[in-house]
């Protein structure tokens, strides 16, 4: 059974902090594009863009990225079943832009690796940064986030669930032991 470790208001504060860090490190918002990794990363990217518009008065474009076909584990456990592919929606030219890739949880790094491959098929950004709401450790690839909402050390037998209002109908971060 999952138990809440971060409530909705703490999630909002973490996203606001990430927004300020992005503005500070980027020295403004020029040439920024948020690209959320489906599913919850898209909603988080939209929130970051909305908060940035409130703070800076500039509307930052937001896209969504489906990485299904780029995953290195897509044929496991049954390699005969084809994956369900959702649409990638990046309506802005990412060439020579600073792309902020957004995801809910960073774990092994494999999702981010797949997202980088998918992103490079769309263009050649000047720079790519990674923003995650939760970094839980246990990397299998040399990937490190640039912006982190919460560092939550976990064991490999635990699962981190991020719930967002837009998709789940409630908002929190919970931890569950896998059996």
From Swiss-Prot:
InterPro entries named among the record's database cross-references: PRibTrfase_dom, PRTase-like, PyrR, PyrR_bifunctional
Q: What is its EC number?
A: 2.4.2.9
The top EC class is: transferase
Q: Does the keyword Signal apply?
A: no
Motif PRPP-binding per UniProt: ranges: 99-111
Q: Which SUPFAM superfamilies does the entry mention?
A: PRTase-like (SSF53271)
* Subunit note: Homodimer and homohexamer; in equilibrium.
The protein, known as: Bifunctional protein PyrR
**Taxonomic classification, please?**
Bacteria, Bacillati, Bacillota, Bacilli, Lactobacillales
Protein's gene: pyrR
